[in-house]
Amino acid sequence: ADGRVTSVKSVCGDKEEIFDGDIFFSSMPVKDLVAGMGSAVPAAPAEIAAGLPYRDFVTVGLLVDKLDLKNETGIKTLNNIVPDCWIYVQDVGVKLGRIQIFNNWSPYLVKDPQHTVWVGLEYFCNEGDDFWSMDEKACVDKAVSELISMGVINKNTKILDSHRERVQKAYPAYFDTYDRMDELVKYLDTFENLYCVGRNGQHRYNNMDHSMATSFEAVSNILSGKKTKENIWGVNTEAEYHEEAADEKKA
């Protein structure tokens, strides 16, 4: 009402609750936020929001006794495992997109980092496709098979534990109606007490640091009375941050 959000409705199963408030933060997918506003949304922003695309994500966690990858760097690691946190997979013969080694983020993430390694195997897919819908055992078996085929582990490696996790809308994508995102932002900013933050809240492929920074900027605006939200939407739009720009600068 009058350019302000006055309440939100929470629906969980058969239970509905109304929450009144003075200030509202939204980190939900902006596509779903606008859809939830109903028929009051003008046609243009509704169309833009409905057309925003996403890439979904499945990660398979495996606890193994060791990796066959050798640490051939000068970087010292606990138990001399490879020092990478992430390894991007370019092998067209497998579906796996990225390997994450949790021991290298922090050994405290692993119960016994001296004798075991937790790896996360990341698969990019679409919600509802064959890989997304695969049962957990088949998914884990495929992940193990692909690691063996790449020589990351071998058929005698002990798989001590496993877990499959699906993540909806993990990657906001920059095609379809995204080229009209500025129009949608302009509409959302007509609600002076609504702050869209985070990766999905802004439909921006930000890392965790920048996603959190959008919230810091929002709180700063609220405390200072600043009305414009350009600084919130502008987090991580500086071209020099991005890897490709850094590479160009080196060249």
Can you say where each PLM-predicted feature lies in the sequence?
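Mid-domain catalytic core of redox enzymes
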Residues: 1-152, 230-240, 249-251
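Short, glycine/charged-rich beta-strand-loop motifs at protein surfaces that mediate ligand recognition
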Residues: 132, 170-173
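C-terminal lid/capping helical subdomain adjacent to the catalytic/cofactor pocket in oxidative enzymes
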Residues: 164, 174-251
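Flexible, glycine/charged-enriched surface loops at secondary-structure junctions
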Residues: 154-160
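Short Gly/Pro-enriched loop/turn and capping motifs at secondary-structure junctions
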Residues: 126, 169-170, 201-203
